[in-house]
Regions:
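Bacterial Sec-dependent N-terminal signal peptides
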Residues: 1-24
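Mature catalytic domains of secreted/periplasmic carbohydrate-active enzymes
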Residues: 22-284
Length: 284
């Protein structure tokens, strides 16, 4: 059985590579690179470069219906976003946010098996999705009730899923990373239900409602602080949602986030995905 799982992982990686080649999902690489100045970050980066092969886990509410992460919540007309039988956008959002959290109950969750299988496949570092764009936390955040530890899975002894995932992989010698979505479509200070949600971006004018944006920044900083404080050694902070950036007038203060995170996790690699520069220690 273990050999079958390993073969499945390898096959999935090869299939994913083929899909990317066909649909050009690969993000453009920067022609320049800004080297970190912190000696501890440079040391960690050298260690990471030697690992060569890693795995990223996307796991969340979207696993219940088996859809493409949380992207169906986004009202954008592209081929890879489908609502699978739901014709009404608002009904879909209600079903996703209010229905799936009542169904997501992975009682056979066993992260030690994940770690064992990926180690057998030769992988040496991992990234785990602590929160995707839908805002559903796979860790026990004190700043929202929209999390795995407050929903159908809350009575399980491993309800704080991220904690046990990171522990299992550290035990097998992996470098561990926390994926975290900068946008949060469930948060009223990002997608405010006073307005429609026409696309992936914040749906109000920040210059007209600066207090809401400040509240969202605080929420984001607090949740990242939890991950950096309560989950043992974290080697990589992998930030997704590149449209949340100063170039789009969505500045969440990356200098402060990086400084806070590295104060708690010295040598931390920061990957502000697709935002080339000081806070993209490696590109994906």
């Amino acid at each position: 059985m273990r050999k079958i799982v390993v073969l499945f992982v390898v096959a999935f990686c090869l299939l994913s590579t083929g899909m990317r080649a066909q649909h050009t999902f690969v993000h453009k690489q920067s022609s320049t690179y800004e080297w970190p100045e912190d000696s501890l970050v440079l040391k960690k980066l050298d260690q990471w470069r030697d690992l060569k092969f890693g795995v990223i886990f996307h796991w969340g509410l979207y696993a219940v219906p088996g859809i493409v992460e949380s992207w169906a919540l986004c009202s954008e007309d592209v081929d890879w976003i489908s609502r699978y039988g739901h014709n009404n956008y608002q009904e879909f959002k209600d079903w996703y946010w209010n229905g799936l959290s009542k169904q997501f109950n992975p009682t056979e969750f066993e992260p030690a098996q994940w770690a064992e299988v990926t180690k057998q496949a030769g992988m040496k570092y991992m990234i785990f999705t602590t929160k995707h764009h839908d805002g559903f936390c796979m860790f026990d955040s004190q700043y929202t009730d929209f999390s795995i530890s407050r929903c159908a899975f809350k009575e399980h002894p491993k309800a704080d899923v991220a904690k046990y995932v990171f522990e299992a992989f550290r035990k097998e010698g992996f470098m561990t990373g926390a994926y975290f979505s900068k946008p949060d479509w469930h948060n009223q200070d990002y997608w405010w239900d006073y307005f429609a949600t026409p696309n992936r971006n914040v749906n109000y004018k920040i210059e007209r409602h600066p207090e809401k944006w400040e509240a969202f920044k605080t929420y984001t900083h607090n949740q990242i602080g939890e991950l950096m404080s309560n989950y043992g050694t974290i080697d990589i902070l992998w930030l997704d949602g590149g449209w949340v950036s100063p170039r789009n007038n969505q500045d969440i203060d990356m200098p402060q986030i990086a400084a806070m995170a590295r104060a708690k996790q010295p040598g931390l690699l920061v990957v502000d995905r697709t935002i080339h520069g000081k806070y993209e220690n490696y590109q994906t």
